[in-house]
Amino acid sequence: MAEKISPGMQQYLDIKQDYPDAFLLFRMGDFYELFYDDAVNAAQILELTLTSRNKNSENPIPMAGVPHHAAAEYIDKLVDLGYKVAVAEQMEDPKKAVGIVKRAVTQVITPGTTIDTANSVDNNFLVAIDFKDKHYALSYMDLSTGEFKVTELSEFSAVVGEIASLKAREIVAGFTLDESQLKVFERQMNLLISEQLEIPENLLIDLSGLTALENQVASKLLAYVKETQMRDLSHLQEVEHYEIKDFLQMDFATKSSLELTANKRENKKHGTLYWLLDETKTAMGTRMLRSWIDRPLISNSAIQKRMEIVQIFLDHFFERSDLIEALKGVYDLERLASRVSFGKAVPVDFLQLANSLSNVPAIKYILGMLNEAPLEELKSQLDEIPELSGLINSAISENASRTITEGGIIKKGYNAQLDKYREALENGTSWIAKLEADEKAKTGISTLRIDYNRKDGYYFHITQSQLNSVPEHFYRKATLKNSERFGSQELTEIEEIMLEAREKSSSLEYDLFMGLRTETEQYIGRLQALAKTIAEIDCLQSLSVVAEKQGYIRPTLTDGSRIVEIKGGRHAVVEAVMGAQEYVPNDIELPEQTDIQLITGPNMSGKSTYMRQFALTVIMAQIGSFVPAETANLPIFDAIFTRIGASDNLISGESTFMVEMSEANHAIQKASSRSLIIFDELGRGTATYDGMALAQAIIEYVHDHIGAKTLFATHYHELTDLDEALDHLDNVHVATLEQNGNVTFLHKITEGPADKSYGIHVAKIAGLPQPLLERADLILQKLENKPLPAKKVADEQEQLSLFDFTENSSEIIEKIKRQNVDNMTAREALNFLWELKDSL
């Protein structure tokens, strides 16, 4: 016969049935309990003690629990690991409950909906995706800031790139996505996939500026958030449409290879452009700066508007210093507003709001003192919100704690009734002190004192040796080993007055605070607008600080121009890491008639750094930053495409060469004459002749059909002859100094092709064995003594012959052809060389 389930456990099972994919935290008194598999799994993940309910039964129920006051910490751990957590609260006072206490889930916390991200200034985006008629709609939201946007995309790769750039951790996927696409999100991108199949009619978004698909996906996202959060979300901003074509387009591979916001080694901020440019002082400014780097501008007027203000801040050191001090006093207004909306704001949050608002007049004053036209718009948008700051300053005590149940929140003078209760408490304390002194005098018991505990209330404490002196009007409350506790009618009367005052004071103070929280909600929109203005000011002062610190100059950007002229350019991040004195600057010149720069030179000589330097300079200029150069004249680029180094493909487990070709194809298909293309060693992932042929064909295609400004680094020195056939291609190389058998890489870009690759020298630096290096040098000399055909590479119709061996060499040649040297380890390369030697 099956064991009977208790009403409490049946209630748990009924609730759990509605949240099968979440850990259910079930409030029972002072603990949140977990049962069954949730308990087993949570005990392991959170290192909790696993116990059991009904231990003596045949099937004890696994159980684990966490104290209610520490629950947030445990919830954060689960959410950080990608789990959902449903929180079931007691919906009535257990003391007043008839039968089982009513319980219900009040919130489902997920990786994409958590707002308690106090230790991070980063956005926490939740994304929804849908697909219809060959178009994808993508909407994203940050519940912690209220940001809510939507766009439409034509390719799945663009969807993947957008999600990766947003660093989203959870997606709400439509049923129109196929299984392979869902696997990309779940397995390759490690995203939590949630569903929202129904959209309540009252949550349907129908904005005229959005397509039907955009309205649908934004509605789906809103419905999911409402369903999981179960509360008013007044801080959510109206959904805003955006187009990726309105910004400098860069796919995720480009952002990753250029290390804009995350480094490749650790996927962290250090050593990135974001790290370099971040001198922001507010959390909102930090988030906005990251979004600027992710989405540089393509409107020259908008770029110049930013640069004008950067220039003003750069020219006024003392005013900027005062501005920075004022910004330091501004807390995270966006997240504070969200906490108010969520009903999670505590007294300290309101003090932070008031302190933040108190710094706004100073910021406004400094902008006014600068008296510059470009600052007028920002100055006019600085809303001091005096009504809110006045309300908080009059209501909240400067010494208020983080909790709302311990009292001491509301200032004296804010509420007359509360002041009366507090006066009663203060009088009661003096009454008790007077009563204690009077009874000591009357009874002659010098050790008599009045104490308090929850069980006995107020009582007279009298030791065993003094019991004979206890007066008749005392009555016994409790007997201890060495003392006894007594009460009196007068003490009881004082206690009743004090307890009533304390209880009513606590209740009234709580109600007053909740009223303040509700009243503050009407200012959320103004707080969010203020936050955006302060964030923009913060970003611009940050760019000016970096420009001053690093010695940057204001670039000249010209609409419609195709001239690139950078004098003394530097790689911004490399220079910051290694120091300006050690960095070798380079000019970058692509005149009107030059579209392609073919770059040759040995490994480790600086080709990749040179190309990345150019891309970063363009990005910096188009976010409104000054740039690392002596002078810089640039066109406005509409997109940057890169193929730099081997990288993983988010969409599938493709080979390095397949990734190379896919990224090259993406650039070829999407680039325009206003784009920047950077190809580093394209074609190295396959056999030599295949790679060379493809590299040449790609160069010719870009030259003849696209006309984009292109930097193309290659080890195929044969390609340098292309400058004779292609009018818009120039050769440059990295200069080297060869002296007494030693080679020094000068890291300087010079006109013309390289005459040597110095691969053996690089191998020497890498520490390959000396016998191997000597053998390689002999082979190289033999190869160099065999002249190549004089005909231009551009006109070749058949595969080049690198060298001639003996009549029995065909087997060796085939071995070399089949070998993909780029994918060989050092050990494999060494073994292969010795194998070839033995065959000669």
Swiss-Prot record:
An annotated GO cellular component of this protein is:
cytosol
| Keywords noted in UniProt | ATP-binding, DNA damage, DNA repair, DNA-binding, Nucleotide-binding
Q: Which Gene3D superfamilies match?
A: 1.10.1420.10, DNA repair protein MutS, domain I, MutS, connector domain, P-loop containing nucleotide triphosphate hydrolases
Annotated PROSITE patterns: DNA_MISMATCH_REPAIR_2
Which SMART domains does the UniProt entry name for this protein? MUTSac, MUTSd
Q: State the Gene Ontology terms under molecular function.
A: ATP binding; ATP-dependent DNA damage sensor activity; damaged DNA binding; mismatched DNA binding
- Which annotated residues bind ATP? 601-608
Q: Does the keyword DNA damage apply?
A: yes
- GO BP annotation list: mismatch repair
SUPFAM superfamilies, per this entry?
A: DNA repair protein MutS, domain I, DNA repair protein MutS, domain II, DNA repair protein MutS, domain III, P-loop containing nucleoside triphosphate hydrolases
NCBIfam families registered for this protein in UniProt: mutS1, PRK05399.1
Q: What does this protein do?
A: This protein is involved in the repair of mismatches in DNA. It is possible that it carries out the mismatch recognition step. This protein has a weak ATPase activity.
UniProt similarity note: Belongs to the DNA mismatch repair MutS family.
Q: This protein is called what?
A: DNA mismatch repair protein MutS
Provide the taxonomic classification. Bacteria, Bacillati, Bacillota, Bacilli, Lactobacillales
